[in-house]
Regions:
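Vicinal oxygen chelate
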Residues: 1-5, 8-17, 45, 59-118, ...
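N-terminal beta-strand motif that seeds the catalytic metal site of vicinal oxygen chelate
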Residues: 1-23, 48-50, 65-67, 117-118
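Short beta-strand-to-loop elements that line the ligand-binding cleft
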Residues: 14, 35, 92-94
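Conserved active-site alpha-helix within GNAT-family acetyltransferase domains
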Residues: 20-29, 102, 111
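Short glycine-/small-residue-rich flexible loop motifs, especially phosphate/cofactor-binding loops
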Residues: 23-24, 41, 78-79
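Conserved acetyl-CoA-binding loop of GNAT-fold acetyltransferases
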Residues: 29-34, 85-87
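Conserved short beta-strand elements that form part of the metal-binding/catalytic scaffold
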Residues: 32-65, 111-116
């Protein structure tokens, strides 16, 4: 196998129907207050992981949690995974701070996130 190795799961996004109630549950679970608390997104850092809550699935239309794998080169990784049979769901986009995200679906329809920090 050639290509670039991932650097592990960086972020897991969870679609939620009630952001305030979900924020309370995840604060209790993780034992920390949110580090980002907006009407469109609540994010936590705990144990070296980022956990995000997205009301109504957000612009990505999430219907289940999505793990975002950190990669050194998002375009190269997209080329590798699509050559292996994945389909691009959302092309790379900058979500702020130089962070690029994209999603693909595997052969069974599972959504996989890719994340590149600059």
């Amino acid at each position: 196998m050639t290509g670039s190795a991932t650097q592990g799961i960086k972020t897991v996004l969870h679609p939620v129907s009630d952001l305030e109630k979900a924020k309370a549950v995840y604060s209790a679970l993780l034992g920390v207050a949110p580090m980002a608390d907006e009407s469109y997104y609540v994010g936590f850092e705990a144990g070296g992981q980022h956990v995000g809550l997205v009301p109504g699935g957000g612009p990505q239309g999430l219907t289940s949690p999505v793990a975002y794998w950190e990669v050194p080169d998002i375009e190269a990784k997209l080329t590798e995974v699509t050559a292996a049979g994945a389909t691009v769901k959302d092309s790379p986009r900058d979500v702020g701070g130089g962070r690029l995200v994209a999603t693909v679906t595997d052969l069974d329809g599972n959504v996989l996130g890719l994340l590149q920090d600059s």
